[in-house]
Amino acid sequence: MVDGLMKLNGKRIVFKGVNRHEFSSITGRVPNRDEVIKDIVTMKKNNINAIRTSHYPDDSMLYKLCDIYGIYMIAENNLESHGTWEAYNKGYVDLDFVVPKDKPQWREMMLDRANSCYQRDKNHPAILIWSCGNESFGGKTIYEMSQLFRQLDKHRLVHYEGVFSDRSYNDTSDMESQMYTPAAGIEKFLAEHPEKPFICCEYTHAMGNSCGAMHKYTELTDREPRYQGGFIWDYIDQSIYKKDRYGKWFLTYGGDFGDRPTDGDFSGNGICYGGEREASPKMQEVKFNYQNISVDFDSDYIFTVTNKNLFVKKELAFKNSLFKCCSKPS
């Protein structure tokens, strides 16, 4: 963190990221090496530069591949108590129901979990940020987790989105992190609260025919230096293969096994399909908005090339063809 901005080797970084669950349509929560490599290669082809390991440490294989291919990481600790604070926010329960909050009986277990997360993965250069977990409200216990990460690692930043719901320990997170805040809302927040840089740890919820208006966020990274990007929710549909009555394989979601209750197809939020892990049409929007090189024309037919890569040389070679010659409009 330099002058209120997250920087990598002295340059302001913009996260063009995705949230990624560990998932295979064949083996469930244990994707194989070929599947993970396909994910990484697909990301590189489509200008994705970062992964948030939502919401737990992934197989070590992923971290090694991110080191090799050059994908930045938010390494997330295994923590989520979504239901308890959501019930509190809806008025169903008292604040005492929320965990871990300030409850001392959670402290030792959570510090151990954070320490395990750090010790296993500390030597991976792909990791730029440690995350205390996901959507677990706020409180002293999670703040102490963040302090443990800082004590163990003087060079990486610490992330936690939950302070958005509970500002009692606002310094838990080194950056302001929110979910699904409109681009205009981010700009307004930064105008009123300029103390920290801002990321969307989840945005552009990719369920169904989605990812429209993504450009409002990526354009904001150019206009507002303290907005430093975000992580799409999420990378791949979590769907499982099953045979129909004719013996043909198809991809299933909640309820297709007679399971009740179920969230239905709410696990299908990816910019890649399940199964063969192919990019969906939504990926075209992602690739365009995450592009690092853009060309703009003005009214005098002069074009400007912008290179947003942090460390790639700015010398570029061009080849152009004139398809039609016309007079300049008056």
Regions found by a protein language model. Give the residues of each.
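Extended substrate-binding grooves/exosites of carbohydrate-active enzymes
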Residues: 1-304, 308-316, 321-329
